[in-house]
Amino acid sequence: MRRRLGRWIIVAVLAGAGCDDTVDGPGPVLPPPPPPGGAPPLAATVTVPPNYGIHDTFVRDGIAILCVWNTGIMILDVGGGGRGGTPTSPVTISTFAPSNGSLASPAIHNAWWFRNPSGVKRYLFLGQEGPATLGASSSGDVKVLDLSNLAQPTEVAFYRVVGAGAHNFWMNEQAQVLYAAFYNGGVVALDVSGSLAGDLAAREIARVQPGGSDSTFVWGVMLAGGRLYASDMLSGFWQLNPQTLQPIGGGQNVPERFGSDLWVRGEYAYTGTWGNREGTRGDAVKIWHLNGSGAPSLVDSIIVDGINTVSDIEVSDNGRLLVFSAEGQSDAGLYIYRLTDPEKPTRIGYANVVQGIHTVSLGRVGTKLYAFAARNPSNPALLIYDLSSLDTP
């Protein structure tokens, strides 16, 4: 079965009831969930050009870097850029459109602002997401910008996998290694130490298709506790060797849905689901326990009626909150759960956004936690939610 991804996304929409969270999986039947929490305060809305809109946002040290597709990137001061910006009143520092590379447009999807072991934040890694067909092909490069001057980014390097396209990144910043999900190309590890320029092909450390050549379409990767994990849309949730990238656990464990994003925290991991797989919607967050060696085993699932896709997922830096974005149908938006029991998250907040939230990133400005959410593609905007009232012991 093939689905179009990238700039042209086709998602089958099924009829659904109203919002009704349940937890579905091994163990006894749970009692009905408590009444869901209300919407967190909306601190600010930053509209972006309707040039296919906004995708990921990377937040670090009071700077928010927006991936604004064919507009390129927008760099915002939200509390650390020296321009007087705050989460309630962001200030634009610069906008920059990288070259098209192997695509017909910039198509900037995701970013990672690299802080090296010396604390220098020079390089910004960008992923292009070009047209793709689930289970068959994808396109788009990794771009590298020099952000020595936030007001004047410059493009300095790139990395390309012929016949495959970049999606999401993670970094081992101490080891100076970039891990990149490349859809049908699998997972790539790149040495990004020292100065970067031109074609980075010679810096490739390893590459793997965890599900094999016929069952690999990797959405994202994450390094946690010295262990590397990958969420594959076709072949499930994997544990990989961080040095060789060879699979060492998991895989072939989400047969009924297409996989999406992932987040790992301590002994638990959470993965999203996407679209429609033979009549089953992407309305689930999978809950995994990681054993002593790090291998995942499924313990439960959050099922959210009234959505088609869980497109982005993150746990707060203190482990208190699980936050995810949802698209499709009547109950799209932003979902917030408390992780008092990591195996049984409890919903405490929800913001309905009918257009859908495509991605969400958590960032702390001062002591307050915020969610930076991408409303996309209609009326595209960055929505900044104040989660401080929910971020309590």
Q: Where in the sequence are the language-model features?
A:
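Bacterial N-terminal signal peptides that target proteins for export
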Residues: 1-9
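C-terminal motif of bacterial Sec signal peptides marking the signal peptidase cleavage site
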Residues: 15-18
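Feature marking well-ordered beta-strand scaffolds used for ligand recognition
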Residues: 20-393
